[in-house]
C-alpha cells in the first residue's frame, strides 16, 4: 500500500470538494492518505483520513516555546538523519543558516512520517519546502490550480525558480497551464494534465422548471476580484438598458460582497440582482434547474467546477477566455467563450442567446451534457490520479 502525504495550508473548505473526492477515491483504490495542514481545522470539518496539524510557531511566547521544544525532540529522536539531510540540502541551495534551522523545526510534523509521495496541493505551499520530499526519500508532487501559477508570483521575483530546478511531478488542470510551465523551463514529461471532475450523478440534466419570460442568469463563485463579478454586473446593467428582462443570482461568499452590492446599486440593477450566499451542492443544483443561462466571466480561472456542473445540467454557458475556461467550454460547440473585461461583449452574447433557434440551443446543450458526462466524471479522474502516482 502506497502512503501519500497531501500538504495544504488548511483542511479543504466546503467549496474545495475536489480534495475530499480525491482522498476518498485514492482510499477506495488501496492508497493510504495522510493530510498535513498548517492551520487547525474547524470542528465541523471532518475528513475521512488522518490529519496532522503543524504546531503553532507564531503567537504567544509560551505556546511557541512548547512547539519549538517538541520539534527539537522530534528532530533528535524521530528523524535525525532526515533532518541532517534536509539541512544540508537547504544549505546547498544557498539558504541562510537561520532559514535552514527554521525549516527543520516547522517541517518536523511532516518529516517524521514515512511516505511514498509528498504531494503539495498548491504551488504556493511547496515554496520553502523544495527539499523536504528528497530528505524523506519520497517522491515529490506539486499541483498548480490557477491563482498559484498566475497570481502569486506577480509581486515575488523568482518565486518558483528553486522549485522548478527540483525533481518534481506536476499536476495541472489544463493544457494551457502545462504550456505555461514548459515555457518556464519545466520538462513537459514531468507535467500531467488532470482536469477537475464533478458528481455527474448529482448534476444531471432534467426538466427545467423555468416558465417565466424573465431570463434567469446564474453564477456560482467566491466573491473575489478575480471572478470578474463587477464586469458581470456592468454587463447586466447594459442588458437592462436594452430592455432585457432578467434576474441575476450569485451563489457564494467572500470579502467583496459589500463592494458588489454597492456596484449593483450604482448601476441601478439592485432589483434584478440577488446574492444568496453559500449553498449546498443540492441547493446549487436547484438553482441551476431554475436558471436559463450560466455566466462565469472571470479575470483569472484555473478551470472551474461550477461551469462543468452548469453544462451537465444543460444550461447555456457564457464564460471568459481566462486560462482553463477556454478548455472547459468549447466555443460555439458547448457554449460561448468571449474576451474578458468586456462587459458590452458579455451583454451582447447573453442577449444573442434569446434569439438562438431552438435546434441550436438543443444542440449546444446536448453536446455539453455528453462531453461532461464522458470526460469530466469522478471515476475517470480517479483513474488518472492512480496512474499519476504510478508514474
PLM feature spans:
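Short hydrophobic beta-strand element within catalytic cores of glycosyltransferases
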Residues: 316-319, 329
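A short, well-ordered alpha-helix in the C-terminal region of glycosyltransferases
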Residues: 272, 359-375, 381-387
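Nucleotide-activated donor-binding/catalytic signature segment of Leloir-type glycosyltransferases, i.e.
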Residues: 261-279
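Aromatic "clamp/platform" in nucleotide-sugar-dependent glycosyltransferases that forms part
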Residues: 299
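Carbohydrate-associated surface elements
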Residues: 176, 197
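Conserved acidic donor-binding segment of nucleotide-sugar-dependent glycosyltransferases
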Residues: 331-332, 336-343, 352-358
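Short alpha-helical donor nucleotide-sugar binding micro-motif in glycosyltransferases
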Residues: 278-279, 286-291
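A conserved mid-protein helix/loop that constitutes part of the nucleotide-sugar donor-binding site
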Residues: 17, 21, 215, 219-238, ...
Amino acid at each position: 500500500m502506497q502512503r501519500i502525504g497531501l500538504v495544504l495550508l488548511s483542511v479543504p473548505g466546503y467549496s474545495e470538494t475536489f480534495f475530499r473526492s480525491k482522498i476518498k477515491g485514492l482510499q477506495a483504490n488501496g492508497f493510504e492518505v495522510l493530510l498535513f495542514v498548517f492551520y487547525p481545522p474547524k470542528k465541523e470539518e471532518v475528513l475521512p483520513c488522518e490529519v496532522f496539524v503543524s504546531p503553532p510557531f507564531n503567537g504567544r511566547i509560551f505556546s511557541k516555546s512548547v512547539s519549538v521544544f517538541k520539534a527539537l525532540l522530534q528532530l533528535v529522536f524521530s528523524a535525525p538523519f532526515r533532518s541532517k539531510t534536509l539541512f544540508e540540502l537547504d544549505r546547498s541551495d544557498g539558504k541562510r543558516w537561520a532559514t535552514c534551522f527554521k525549516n527543520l523545526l516547522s517541517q518536523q510534523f511532516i518529516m517524521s512520517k514515512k511516505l511514498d509521495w509528498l504531494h503539495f496541493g498548491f504551488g504556493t505551499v511547496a515554496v520553502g519546502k523544495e527539499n523536504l520530499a528528497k530528505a524523506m526519500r519520497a517522491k515529490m508532487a506539486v499541483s498548480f490550480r490557477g491563482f498559484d501559477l498566475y497570481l502569486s508570483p506577480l509581486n515575488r521575483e523568482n518565486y518558483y525558480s528553486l522549485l522548478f530546478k527540483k525533481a518534481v511531478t506536476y499536476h495541472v488542470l489544463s493544457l494551457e497551464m502545462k504550456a505555461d510551465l514548459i515555457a518556464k523551463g519545466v520538462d513537459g514529461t514531468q507535467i500531467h494534465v488532470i482536469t477537475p471532475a464533478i458528481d455527474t450523478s448529482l448534476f444531471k440534466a432534467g426538466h427545467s422548471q423555468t416558465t417565466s419570460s424573465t431570463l434567469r442568469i446564474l453564477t456560482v463563485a467566491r466573491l473575489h476580484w478575480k471572478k470578474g463579478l463587477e464586469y458581470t454586473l456592468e454587463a447586466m446593467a447594459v442588458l437592462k438598458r436594452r430592455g432585457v428582462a432578467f434576474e441575476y443570482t450569485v451563489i457564494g461568499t467572500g470579502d467583496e460582497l459589500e463592494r458588489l452590492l454597492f456596484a449593483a446599486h450604482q448601476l441601478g440593477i439592485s432589483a434584478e440582482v440577488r446574492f444568496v450566499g453559500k449553498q449546498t451542492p443540492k441547493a446549487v443544483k436547484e438553482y441551476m434547474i431554475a436558471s436559463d443561462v450560466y455566466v462565469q466571466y472571470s479575470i483569472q480561472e484555473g478551470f472551474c467546477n461550477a461551469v462543468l456542473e452548469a453544462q451537465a445540467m444543460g444550461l447555456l454557458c457564457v464564460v471568459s477566455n481566462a486560462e482553463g475556461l477556454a478548455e472547459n467550454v468549447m466555443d460555439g460547440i458547448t457554449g460561448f467563450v468571449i474576451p474578458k473585461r468586456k462587459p458590452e461583449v458579455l451583454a451582447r452574447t447573453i442577449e444573442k442567446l434569446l434569439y438562438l433557434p431552438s435546434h441550436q440551443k438543443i444542440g449546444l446543450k446536448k453536446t455539453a451534457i455528453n462531453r461532461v458526462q464522458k470526460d469530466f466524471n469522478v471515476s475517470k479522474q480517479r483513474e488518472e490520479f492512480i496512474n499519476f502516482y504510478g508514474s
